[in-house]
Amino acid sequence: MTADTRPLHSGSRRLVRRTLLLFLCLILTLSAATLPAYAEDAPASSDVGVVLLLNLENNLVLYEKEADTPVYPSSSVKIMMGLLACRSLATRLNETVTVSSAMVAGITGRSLHLADGETLTVRDLLYAAICGGYNDAAAVVACLSSGSVAAFVEDMNEEAARLGMTHTNYTNPTGLHDPAMSTTARDLSIIAREAYGNELYMLISSARTYTVPATNVSEARLFTNRNSLISDSSQNYYNGYCAGMNAGMTDEGGWCVVTVCERNGASNLCIILRGLDVASGELIPAYVQANRLLSWANRNYGYRTVLSAGETLDTLRVGMTGISKSKADVVPSEDLKIYLPTDLDVEGQLVYDLVLDDEGLTAPLTAGDNVGTVTVSYHGSIVGKAPLTVTEDFKRNGFLNALGLFKGYLMGRSFWLAIPIFAIMLLPYLYATGSSRGRYGLRTVQRRKRIRYIKRHF
């Protein structure tokens, strides 16, 4: 038989080409479906000197640059100022106060132009200092909180020390440049977390605008939030997911932007320090970089279920049951979700540690009893915890229970305290028997020897 070497008709050739094309498309589709998705790199931050991006729920650092380098704090000082003022003045919001020239003496920079003798409410002053970023208002609330600006600065440094902000020193409540004043992004994240937990501070620092009503010396004053991520006055920077905190600049410290992005169930703290200043009309790099980083985090991080309720983590022996093979499944009592990279291999890159409340499991146990904690670590840091429970009941053996109580008594303090008391009580008897040794000496010796003999035989 000879092979058919006749050329294919054009219709047949088209059919072959279509078949091959469909086959190649199928291979490419399947390959794409099986390829792992890798997280993209964080956006470059060459125009800002210091960056820290932190997930607040899990205290997980998403991105950092020079986060432990001491820098001039610039306007970020107002986060500490605002928090302490909100704590101190929360019950006085409707109180009317009078500004004195002494309160604002020597204050320069961004100003609401508060006048000597002007009366306005504590609420107005807090909004002006925190939302508007006005230095003269910050000085007045410092005086209202602690009696003087100097005393308030002492309170700021005491709070920083209490919180463990070891690289931070304040010399004023405004952020105006002073070579003696410094902080780090890591330190700043500590006070920012505290401020995020203060409802009044977050309410004020998240306001887009505020109007100070007309006073005895001024017409009504409307201002926007100093932080352009919060204020929608500039669509170049506005981020509808951002809440609160602070922004501003000094020539020496550069631009600082601090905010919290609340999106998809996560709260991410973004800190930018030493941002470059630019000419009027150009985009401010600190704002641009903050938005880029927050968008990057939203694309590449999310909440992952790393433990499921009832999932057996280990099977451990249960003591005091009287049954040598009594074992209990140890399980988390609740699901645990942790904010992690979306491409993370949960099984391969997380470390799970079981920490039991006691050295081991001991009956009696009831299903659902908490017996310890499972901690989950990522890159050496604990990022989540869940309580551990057992799934069934275990009764204690009566004989082993009594034996355990007796052992506990022997090992207890009361037993050892009783020994010297018993010895003291025995002394009179020993003295009495010793004084009669001459009369009954032979009998006593014989009795002792007999006892020893019996002991040897037994």
Placement of each model-derived feature along the sequence:
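C-terminal segment of classical bacterial N-terminal signal peptides
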Residues: T29-Y38
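N-terminal Lys/Arg-rich, disordered targeting/topogenic segments
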Residues: M1-S12, S436-F458
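Sec-dependent N-terminal signal peptides
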Residues: R14-I27, A418
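Membrane-helix interfacial "entry" motifs
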Residues: S10-R14, L120, L405, Y409
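Active-site-adjacent loops and short helices of periplasmic peptidoglycan-processing enzymes
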Residues: A37-R186, I190-I204
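Coil-to-alpha-helix initiation sites in intrinsically disordered, low-complexity, charged segments
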Residues: S10-R14, S88, D393-N401, K449
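Domain-terminus/edge residues, biased toward the C-terminal soluble/receptor-binding domains
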Residues: M165-T166, A180-S182, R186-D187, A192-L442, ...
